[in-house]
């Protein structure tokens, strides 16, 4: 299901060495709770250890001491095969290759997979399944990369998360980490990485008591409301604008940021978004 060859395309040696260090120090017993959507490389996934009893079916995988719920990869598509009920493809990110399957349930799924072709850079959000040496990945969101700075940004996010999580293992209490490795009580309270490939500052929302609340978190909380999680098509941008009574441009900045880091993804069009982490 997985192969871990080392192709010539962008192979960051420094990052590879840091991953090897992480693999040596990470064991299932160091798990600190599941992260939401973790930016990872294929090499990190290949070295991930399964938590719980060895060989236990359904046990989550652990990377740098953190259980993975959903993962995000960026890489080149190859071997795309279309069937009536699913589309399979391979992602090559320069550190290895990982096979994915994307189930096709409706027209929106078909349109999403049709936009992806062999030789194209894509961003994929999915989950890991299987046992220790037989990992497989199921994709539930895939989109083409239109700005190639996103490839570099993804690797920066992987490095940052690796450093944050491995550093926290030394003499610190157990924590739950957000997708970018910042400690938080709910996994989402801090998002301090670059807001996009253009490195715009994260928008903030001034509330009535004079304090400033991270607008990204406020918008994300709307997507995570039970009714919106259950909605087939997610939430329209206009609904977010009405909720916060802020300029549409400001809301779009927050939504673009959340989509860039994998917390939400577009559904039927570029105006509808849904949480990538459903509780």
Swiss-Prot record:
This protein's major location comes to: nucleus
Could you tell me which residues form the DNA-binding region? 71-145
Tissue specificity comment: Expressed in root tips, roots, shoot apical meristem (SAM), young leaves, flag leaves and ears, and at lower levels in mature leaves.
Please give the record's induction comment.
Answer: Repressed by sucrose starvation. Induced by gamma irradiation.
Instruction: Quote one Gene Ontology molecular function term.
Output: telomeric DNA binding
What are the GO BP annotations of this UniProt entry?
A: DNA replication; double-strand break repair via homologous recombination; nucleotide-excision repair
The cross-references to SUPFAM superfamilies, in alphabetical order and at most eight, read: Nucleic acid-binding proteins, Winged helix' DNA-binding domain
Keywords carried by this UniProt record: DNA damage, DNA recombination, DNA repair, DNA replication, DNA-binding, Nucleus
Amino acid composition bias (Polar residues), ranges on this chain = 190-199
Q: Which InterPro entries does the entry mention?
A: NA-bd_OB-fold, RFA2-like, Rfa2/RPA32, RPA_C, WH-like_DNA-bd_sf, WH_DNA-bd_sf
Q: Name one GO cellular component term.
A: nucleus
The subcellular location is: Nucleus
Annotated segments matching region Disordered: 1-39, 181-210
Gene3D superfamilies registered for this protein in UniProt: Nucleic acid-binding proteins, Winged helix-like DNA-binding domain superfamily/Winged helix DNA-binding domain
Origin: domain of life? Eukaryota
Assembly and binders:
Heterotrimer of RPA1, RPA2 and RPA3 (canonical replication protein A complex). Interacts with RPA1A, RPA1B and RPA3.
Protein's job: Component of the replication protein A complex (RPA) required for DNA recombination, repair and replication. The activity of RPA is mediated by single-stranded DNA binding and protein interactions.
Q: What family, per the record?
A: Belongs to the replication factor A protein 2 family.
- What protein name does the entry list? Replication protein A 32 kDa subunit A
**Species for this entry:** Oryza sativa subsp. japonica (Rice)
The encoding gene is RPA2A
